[in-house]
Each structure stands twice: as C-alpha cells, then as structure tokens.
C-alpha cells in the first residue's frame, strides 16, 4: 500500500497549483493541494496527503522532526526535483510570498527552444484546452499571440476534477484512470508559472514523470534495504544519491513492422492492412502493460510508446533485471512460435543516475546513445545457435502457403490461410465499428502470454469485465474513468471507407487510381538527441516533446482528415511516420495540408518528406508500399542545388523518382500553374486535349541543345491562341523556358484529373 500511496501522492503533488490559480486563496500550493485532496474521504490518507503537503524543502524542514525518517514525501520531494531538472537549493514554491508568480501565464511550446541554434528561439504558447470523454480535444496549435489563462479556466478545471475524483480511489485499480484524468485536464496547464523560466512543461507531463521516478526510487530503496529516506534524500549528504545509478532506462524495439504490414497479397489484402497495423500497435501497448504489471508499476513509467518503440523508466535492482530477463525469454519464445523471424522485439536497458536524468553532468544524451547501441547489439545477435537450428528444421518442402502472407505453417485445415491472417480478417470488420478492445483468455487475435484480443461493444466489454477480473480493456481515442476500467490508446486511424473499390466509385472525374502516401519526419532522431539545448534538457522536456509528436500523428491527423472528409484511409501512423491510401486526388491535396499543419504545429522547427505513388486498385499492396517507399527515399535525398553537399529533405516526390520537388515548389509553383491551366483549358474539346499531350511531348524534348523543340513549341502555342488566349499562350511559353519541369508536372496532373474514367 505504501507504493500506491507514493504513486498517487506523486501524481497529485502539484494539484494545489490549480487551486491556487483558480481561486483567491493566498496560501502555498502545497497546503492548498493537501486541503483539496482531503475533502475527498477516500483520499484522507496521511502518507498520500503528506506527499502533497511536504514536497518542498521549506515545508519539510518545518515538520521533519515530527515525521518518520521513512516518510514517503521525501521520495516525492526528490522525484519532483529530478523531474524538473531542478537543483534542490533552488526550491521555490508557487504561492510563496516574495516571488512574482504570474497566474495567467499560458503553457509555452516545447518547440520554442528546439533547434534554436539553427532556427532561433521563439515565444509561442497554447490556447487553453481541457479534453473530456465526450468532447474530442480540438486542434490546438501554438501561436505567437500572448495567450492568458484566466481564473475562470482554472475554476472550470476544479469543477471537473471534483466530479472525477469522487469516482476514484487511491488504489491499484484506479491509478490508470487517475492518469487519464490528468492527461485530459492537465495537458495544457503549465507546471510552473515563473516567467523567468521556460514554462513549456505541462503539469501532466511533470507529474507523471515525478510519479515514475518516485516509484523507481521506492523499488530501489526496498532492494537496497534503505529505510532512512530523510538521510538519503534530504539531509546534507543527500547529494550522493544524485550520482547513484538507481534507475534503468529500458526500451522495446520492434523489427519487421513494415514487412508484416505490407507483405500480403490476396483478394482481401487492402482491407486487412489497417488490422495488421493496429495489431502491432496493440501488441506493443499490451507488452508494455504486462511488463509493468510484473514490476508492480503503473503506466506513469511509460515515457513513450508508439511507432514500434517504447521507453520505460524502471528501478535498477537485481529483481527488476531478473524479471526483464525472464520476460525477454518468454516474449522471444512467443514471437518465434507465432511469427518465426518475421517479427522480433529487442529489449535493452542501461543504468542511469538522477544527475543523468537531470543532465547535470551533460550525460542525458548518452542515455539514449547507450540504449541505441545495446539495442543494435541485440538485433545483431537476436537468436541463439539452438534457436537457429530449430528454425532450420521446421520447414517442409512443397507445403501449402497462406494465400495472404505466403507462410506455410499455422495453416487452418482445409483452408489456404494461416491462423494469424484469418484472425486479422475477422477482426478487421470490427475495427471501424468498435472502439473497445478486450484482452482475455478467449478471443480472436493471439496475444502474448496465453491471451487473446477481441473488438467488442461497450456493453459487451462491461459485461465481460464484471464477470472476469482478468480482463484487460483498451479504448481507442476515448477516455473512461473508473475502477480498473479502460486504458485509453490514441491512434491515427481515420477511415473514409474500408472498401477501396467503393471509395473510388465515389470519384466522378479523373483517372481511376489509388494514391499512396508515405511520409516521415526529417531528422527526428537528431532533434530528439541534440535539438534541445543543454540548459533545458530534462526527462520532463523530452517526454513532453515525444508526446507532442504522438499527439499530432495519433490525434490531430484524424481531425485534419475528417474536416473535409478526405477519401483516405490511414494505414499506419506512428510517432514520426505515416502511410495512407486513398483516392489519388485527395492524397495529393491532403499532402499539402499535412505539410502546412505540421509546420504550424512545430513552428517550422521540423519538416516532413513524403513520397506519393499512384496505382491500380488490384496492384499488389507490398509493391505499392515498396515503390512509394522508394519515392519517399528520393524526397529524403532532395537537394535544391545539385552542387549541395548535404540533402535538405523537406520535399515530396510525385509518382516517379525523377519528380522530386520542395513543398514550396509544389504549393506555390506547380499548384499555381495547375490552377491557371484548369481555368484556361476547362472548355477545350478532345482536339484541345490532344494539344496538351503534344505540349507535354515537346516540353520533355526540350533541353539546352534542342532549340528546334522550342521553335515547335512556339508554333504549337500560336495555333492554340484562339482557344486559350494570347496572354496565357505567352505565359505557357515563358514557363516552358524558365520552369519546364514544374510545367510538365502541372500539365500531367491536369490530364490525370480530367481524364475520362
């Protein structure tokens, strides 16, 4: 129970800041928070409320003589300091007399200081937003406007918190619901209102990392038989703790993701794409939760999960390492049994100290470098000699293959489909209808450790939960609050129609083709490791940055697509990359929206590169993915000047690897030409259409040594002056000389958009 009280107390340790900002009370936030929580009978627990009342040095000094030396508030105190990257001697409390706190200051953007050496520092902030279950968080982008948060905003939060906290208890079954409340209500509440500092860390991010650190310290002390928390964490010799490797930074890294999603064929390949992507997302979420369960930790200890990766903060104990070793063995056995070598999850960890997490020794970046090296080593030596021998003896010659994924094992009797593909096809029908997913002893999709997953209605899930305590429930993009109820998972899963044939049937004009977009954030790894200046690098800030990226791809993406009902299905949206299929015109149009909104969201501190392919509906999915991936790679290699040494990226490739353009060229050159062409060519008959094809042929033949084609071009344009006007004919001629490549692209898009179906 001590650990539960510590986690809940650490999560709620700064709740008094909301009370302070939303009322006229003049007391310190620690006192206000303690009084507020004690107004709920179920939270009247001294160990818990002390973590709220006494997490600053001044308050601790005044009561330590009357408190036990193993009081939990000492752990919350130091975890609070580590989370904020703050030296314990600079321990200021919001609401204290003599300091100039600005109650109305808005949450700043973490992108303000990102890559500031190259792109400068900004002063953007967020408008106030609180997300509830029934109201989806609106698109909330940082603005240069000096936003202010009024007392009324905070008063509204207090009302919402009272309603939710009445339904919660400080126990294991309610911790995740408490976290979800905090994420919904506190994501845009600044942790600090000190305008002399950066105010870009939300109260939610600071509080959850504080709880993660606190629970890890608790486990470390239990293993080391340390019982005098006052001496270890508060008295003068407490500085020694900051150098102890009390923590483990641990990660999961899934390999084979793209091949698993895309390397399928068969009549139902397109329909099962989303199911395969969703399955991998859920695998990583469930694996992370299962490990936390074994370690007796909460989801606060998940620093990031998404895109085939997860990062967790754990205690550096022999018990933790033993659990990790057993877990890794069991996990690998399951993946080998179900997927052979097609999918693999690497697990690695590295020991870290509080000073590492605070970057006081300049070693914070080294945590991720060491972790990356250990993960790479695991991937390079993923199987033992015995496992490889077993794999080599499992194959059978002339075996029937699965009609979808071409596997020759796990086939269902009397059917040419394997168990996994069959299950994915069954669940794919429910993915767009249901938002609740249950992991239990019985179900449809195989999950690790003897469990199965099913998509159910709310009433079905609720009934199952009441009858079986072992059931684990996840909700997709919906928050639920209650006892051991549901874990919210945000997913970029916008679906216009599950049937692509029906989707294309709705397009009345233009070539009947699917468009495929693959996009990736440029240099994201570099930004994560080196983008935040040393003075501001901390575990809370990197957690904030990671969550911001997830919010864009897993939450805002859905809203951007739904605003104009784009005929597009999101197949995969990770923490930094994207794969979508839809009507090709909608894919092309939305690509500009994606680029613009991502630039707005990151304040032009980050960019995105993309490849856009066009294919017939029956074209093999694996080839669609591969060829569009090649187009994306071409965009990543974009150089505005051939003499440039380094690629600038921030580009898009259209249909063919030779058609690589900067986003600015596509938006402000090609699309401008396309609009002019559409306006002037819209009344052309079939003879006029032939003129366009002739024009493209001539343009493709023009180069520095072919003046004859320039003459032919001028002659062809002169013959069309009567139909398109002399002015536009001259403009086409000028474009042909100055911007031939973009003119060809604009003409080709026009033909594709107006071609008979």
Please tell me what each predicted stretch does.
Residues 379-463, 479:
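Cys/His-rich short segments
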Residues 315, 326, 330, 349, ...:
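Cyclic nucleotide signaling catalytic output domains
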Residues 211-222, 278-297, 325-335, 547-567, ...:
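Alpha-helical scaffold within the catalytic cores of cyclic-nucleotide enzymes
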Residues 334-345, 370-385, 601-605, 627-659:
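Catalytic/regulatory signature loops of cyclic-dinucleotide turnover enzymes
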Residues 1-5, 30-43, 201-237, 467-469, ...:
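Alpha-helical phosphate/pyrophosphate-handling elements in metalloenzyme active cores
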Residues 641-757:
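Long, compositionally biased charged/polar accessory segments in the mid-to-C-terminal portions
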Residues 1-137, 142, 189-193, 242-243, ...:
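Divalent metal-dependent catalytic cores for phosphoryl transfer on phosphate-bearing substrates
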Residues 48-55, 248, 300-313, 340-358, ...:
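A short glycine-enriched loop-to-beta-strand structural element that forms part of the catalytic core
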């Amino acid at each position: 129970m001590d650990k539960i009280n510590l986690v809940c107390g650490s999560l709620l340790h700064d709740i008094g800041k909301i009370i302070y900002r939303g009322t006229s009370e003049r007391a310190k936030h620690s006192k206000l928070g303690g009084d507020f929580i004690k107004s709920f009978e179920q939270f009247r627990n001294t160990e818990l409320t002390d973590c709220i009342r006494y997490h600053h040095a001044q308050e601790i000094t005044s009561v330590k003589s009357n408190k036990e030396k193993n009081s939990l508030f000492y752990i919350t105190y130091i975890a609070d300091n580590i989370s904020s990257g703050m030296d314990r001697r600079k321990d200021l409390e919001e609401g204290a007399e003599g300091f100039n706190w600005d109650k109305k200051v808005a949450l700043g953007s973490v992108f303000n200081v990102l890559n500031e050496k190259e792109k400068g520092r900004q002063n953007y902030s967020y408008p106030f937003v609180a997300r509830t279950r029934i109201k989806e968080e609106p698109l909330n982008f940082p603005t240069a406007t000096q936003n202010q948060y009024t007392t009324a905003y905070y008063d509204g939060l207090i009302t919402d918190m009272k309603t939710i906290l009445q339904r919660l208890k400080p126990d294991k079954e309610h911790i995740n619901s408490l976290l979800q409340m905090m994420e919904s209500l506190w994501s845009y509440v600044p942790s600090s209102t000190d305008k002399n500092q950066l105010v870009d860390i939300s109260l939610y991010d600071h509080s959850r990392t504080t709880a993660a650190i606190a629970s890890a310290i608790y486990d470390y002390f239990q293993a080391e038989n340390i019982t005098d928390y006052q001496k270890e964490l508060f008295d003068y010799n407490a500085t020694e703790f900051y150098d102890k490797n009390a923590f483990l930074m641990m990660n999961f890294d899934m390999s084979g993701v793209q091949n698993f999603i895309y390397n399928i064929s068969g009549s139902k390949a397109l329909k099962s794409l989303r199911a395969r992507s969703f399955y991998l997302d859920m695998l990583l979420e469930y694996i992370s939760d299962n490990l936390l369960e074994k370690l007796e930790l909460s989801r606060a200890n998940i620093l990031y999960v998404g895109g085939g990766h997860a990062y967790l903060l754990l205690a550096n104990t022999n018990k933790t390492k033993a659990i990790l070793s057993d877990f890794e063995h069991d996990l690998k056995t399951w993946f080998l049994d179900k997927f052979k070598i097609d999918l693999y999850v690497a697990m690695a960890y590295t020991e870290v100290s509080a000073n590492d997490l605070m970057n006081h020794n300049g070693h914070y970046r080294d945590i991720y470098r060491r972790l990356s090296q250990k993960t790479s080593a695991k991937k390079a030596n993923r199987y033992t000699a015995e496992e490889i021998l077993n794999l080599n003896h499992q194959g059978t010659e002339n075996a029937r293959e699965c009609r979808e994924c071409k596997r020759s094992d796990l086939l269902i009797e009397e059917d040419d489909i394997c168990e996994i593909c069959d299950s994915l096809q069954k669940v794919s029908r429910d993915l767009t209808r249901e938002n609740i997913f249950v992991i239990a002893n019985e179900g449809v999709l195989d999950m690790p450790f003897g469990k199965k997953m099913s998509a159910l209605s709310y009433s079905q899930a609720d009934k199952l939960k009441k009858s079986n305590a072992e059931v684990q429930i996840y909700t997709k993009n919906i928050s639920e609050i209650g006892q051991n109820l549901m874990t919210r998972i945000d997913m970029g899963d916008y679906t216009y129609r599950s049937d692509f044939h029906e989707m294309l049937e709705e397009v009345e004009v233009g070539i009947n083709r699917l468009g495929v977009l693959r996009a990736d954030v440029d240099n994201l790894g570099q930004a994560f490791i080196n983008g935040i200046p040393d003075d501001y690098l901390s575990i809370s800030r990197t957690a904030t940055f990671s969550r911001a990226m997830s919010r864009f791809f897993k939450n805002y993406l859905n809203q951007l697509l739904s605003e104009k009902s784009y005929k597009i299905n999101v197949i995969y949206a990770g923490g930094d990359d994207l794969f979508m299929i839809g009507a090709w015109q909608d894919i092309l149009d939305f690509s500009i929206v994606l680029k613009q909104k991502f630039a707005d969201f990151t304040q032009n501190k980050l960019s995105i590169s993309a490849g856009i392919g066009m294919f017939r509906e029956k074209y093999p999915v694996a080839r669609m993915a591969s060829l569009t991936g090649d187009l994306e790679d071409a965009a990543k290699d974009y150089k505005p000047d051939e003499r440039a040494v380094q690629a600038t990226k921030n580009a898009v490739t259209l249909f063919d690897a030779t058609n690589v353009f900067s986003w600015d060229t596509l938006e402000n050159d090609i699309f401008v030409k396309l609009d002019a062409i559409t306006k002037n060519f819209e009344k052309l008959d079939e003879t006029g259409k032939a003129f366009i094809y002739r024009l493209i042929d001539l343009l493709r033949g023009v180069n520095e040594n072919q003046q004859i084609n320039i003459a032919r071009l001028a002659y062809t344009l002169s013959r069309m002056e009567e139909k398109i006007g002399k002015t536009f004919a001259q403009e086409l001629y000028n474009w042909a000389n100055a911007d031939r490549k973009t003119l060809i692209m604009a003409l080709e898009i026009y033909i594709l958009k107006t071609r008979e179906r």
